[in-house]
């Protein structure tokens, strides 16, 4: 919970045992043992770090090292040792505020919440300092006194209006005291006066969403994302747009946040924005080296083209799809490539080979059978073409324009052949 009642440690690491011979020069002692202590701390060897800081205090008599040694005992979760050394330190410095906080912390860890609360109250009333109000709030929270927790947090909040305390006040009001409107009002006022933050904007958005005010929720999520560029906030906005099926807003959000490019690609395809879809698929291919995206890039390039009969353009698309299908072996793209070659008379036999590979994987696909029928038609093999297109008709009917056009053309081919 609250662990800011002690001094914040810096740290980096190398691990050594305490030397048996202590250097006599005070500066050498401090520098050497400080390095040892920081090394142990960064390696999460907290008891070892404690021994170094404890030795530093013995060699220098600087009270700072008492605080740091106690912090290491707290980090090691050795409550018994923490209690003993806190008591020893208080015997030497009974009026020390930091040591009094450690005493309260020990009581909390021992589960003596009422005594901890009593001492924390006296300490906070006496010092009227931020850390003591936070510690008192923690004791009230342990006792389940949510109203008392909020009151203590408010006293801390008025000293510096920090966002973490504001967030805790709002969360307890909303979740524990059921003061939902007050919690929302409090956060709005804080943001209006002291400015927004990633934490508070996301919290306010979650309150709105939980209350069913999705438009307000997504607005604050978007504003917070625009200000701080935190992806998790964009994710919350995206969830709402997905729920609302607001594809336009979803697309705009995904474009600026780059949160989910595969989803953005799907959205481009849904609205038939094939130019953007092709560019994005190419970007995804370059980033992930996935041949699926290479295939999609050329499919969308073809679908979005204004002149599909340009020989150079068709050749570019076919070559791209061939490259993709070297690794991909997906029936959808094998058939697409094969049909493209058949329809544009670019080596019809080779195109039929791609279609047959697709049919090996999905032999009951009416669309792949239709492609094969069209290949036989292009080769003037009208009997086989008619047999296949009639099979397609029996499977899916002729409601689709392309199937109906193929059937009519092949029936004429059959008639002509007679």
Regions found by a protein language model. Name each.
Residues 34-35, 64-69, 98-105, 131-138, ...:
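Alpha-solenoid helical repeat scaffolds
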Residues 127-235:
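Solenoidal tandem-repeat scaffolds enriched in leucines and small polar residues
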Residues 14-87, 91-98, 118, 411-418:
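N-terminal leader/linker segments that initiate helical-solenoid repeat arrays
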Residues 20, 49-54, 79-91, 113-125, ...:
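Alpha-helical repeat scaffolds
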Residues 42, 72-76, 109-110, 142-143, ...:
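Register position in tetratricopeptide repeats
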Residues 299-311, 321-360, 371-375:
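Alpha-helical adaptor scaffolds
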């Amino acid at each position: 919970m609250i662990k800011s009642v002690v001094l914040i440690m810096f740290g980096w690491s190398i691990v050594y045992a305490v030397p048996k011979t202590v250097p006599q020069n005070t500066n050498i002692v401090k520098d050497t043992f400080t390095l040892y202590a920081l090394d142990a701390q960064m390696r999460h060897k907290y008891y070892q770090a404690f021994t170094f800081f404890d030795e530093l205090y013995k060699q220098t008599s600087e009270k700072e090292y008492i605080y740091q040694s106690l912090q290491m005992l707290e980090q090691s979760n050795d409550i018994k040792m923490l209690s003993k050394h806190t008591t020893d330190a208080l015997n030497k410095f009974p009026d020390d505020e930091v040591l009094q906080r450690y005493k309260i912390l020990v009581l909390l860890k021992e589960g003596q919440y009422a005594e901890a609360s009593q001492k924390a109250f006296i300490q906070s009333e006496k010092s009227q300092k931020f850390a003591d109000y936070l510690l008192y709030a923690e004791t009230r929270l342990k006792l389940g006194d949510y109203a008392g927790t909020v009151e203590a947090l408010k006293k801390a909040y008025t000293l510096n209006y920090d966002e973490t305390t504001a967030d805790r006040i709002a969360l307890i009001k909303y979740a524990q005291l059921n003061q939902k409107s007050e919690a929302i009002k409090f956060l709005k006022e804080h943001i209006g006066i002291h400015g927004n933050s990633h934490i508070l904007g996301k919290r306010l958005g979650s309150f709105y969403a939980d209350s069913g005010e999705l438009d307000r929720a997504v607005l604050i999520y978007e504003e917070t994302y625009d200000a701080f560029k935190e992806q998790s906030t964009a994710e919350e906005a995206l969830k709402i747009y997905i729920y609302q099926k607001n594809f336009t807003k979803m697309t705009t959000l995904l474009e600026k946040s780059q949160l989910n490019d595969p989803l953005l690609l799907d959205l481009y395809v849904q609205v038939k924005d094939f130019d953007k879809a092709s560019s994005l698929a190419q970007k995804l291919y370059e980033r992930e080296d996935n041949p699926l995206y290479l295939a999609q890039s050329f499919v969308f390039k073809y679908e979005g083209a204004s002149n599909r009969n340009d020989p150079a353009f068709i050749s570019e698309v076919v070559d791209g799809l061939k490259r993709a299908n070297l690794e991909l072996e997906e029936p959808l793209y094998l058939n697409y490539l094969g049909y493209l070659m058949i329809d544009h008379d670019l080596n019809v036999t080779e195109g039929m080979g791609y279609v047959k590979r697709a049919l090996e994987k999905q032999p009951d696909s009416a669309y792949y059978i239709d492609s094969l029928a069209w290949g036989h038609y292009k080769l003037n093999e009208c009997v086989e073409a008619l047999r296949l297109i009639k099979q397609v008709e029996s499977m899916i009917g002729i409601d689709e324009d392309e199937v109906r056009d193929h059937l009519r053309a092949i029936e004429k081919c059959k008639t002509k052949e007679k």
